[in-house]
């Protein structure tokens, strides 16, 4: 590997160490090299975007280890540019919030994200966006994970009576 990359074996080892710190499982065998055993469980930008088949959603991804809220960062971006479909992800939020500015605990281990959308429909339909988004999330969870979540009015997704997701819309 060091010959192909034209770097020292120590440099390869340091890079492998960095890759492991991102959650990738890498096996090493003396005199043979390294082998990727399993990918990271983190929502890393390149993991999110590599197989996307969308026109605009997720074409740009911002990733943070910790942030106050992904929503605040997304609002700043949205106010300065027209980045439609941009996704903001963080491993942990220190100031997560829900509807009516209620505190929302967002420790490491969850999926904390915001998506910037500039929809092309009449603003009177905006009230339908949270329920439509929650419904789409339920359908995706059921299809991919083969479990049946439920909607709790107006913006929550629950599983066995426990909240697993909430959809918050800011304008």
Which residues fall in each region the model found?
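Acidic (Asp/Glu) carboxylate-rich active-site/surface patches
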Residues: 136-171
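N-terminal lobe of the biotin/lipoate ligase/transferase fold
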Residues: 1-143, 163-165
């Amino acid at each position: 590997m060091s010959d192909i990359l034209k770097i020292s074996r120590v440099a390869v080892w340091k890079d492998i160490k960095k890759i492991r710190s991102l959650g990738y499982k890498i096996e090493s065998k003396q005199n043979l090299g390294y082998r990727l055993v399993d990918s990271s469980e983190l929502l890393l930008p390149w993991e999110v975007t590599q197989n996307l088949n969308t026109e605009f959603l997720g074409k740009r991804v911002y990733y943070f280890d910790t942030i106050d809220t992904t929503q605040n960062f997304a609002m700043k971006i949205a106010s300065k540019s027209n980045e439609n479909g941009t996704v903001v992800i963080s491993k942990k939020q220190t100031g997560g919030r829900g509807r009516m500015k209620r505190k929302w605990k967002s420790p490491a281990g969850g999926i904390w994200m915001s998506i910037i959308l500039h929809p092309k429909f009449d603003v009177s339909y905006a009230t339908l966006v949270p329920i439509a988004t929650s419904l789409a999330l339920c359908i995706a969870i059921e299809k991919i994970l083969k479990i049946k979540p439920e909607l709790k009015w107006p913006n929550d997704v629950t599983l066995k009576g426990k909240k697993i997701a909430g959809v918050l819309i800011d304008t």
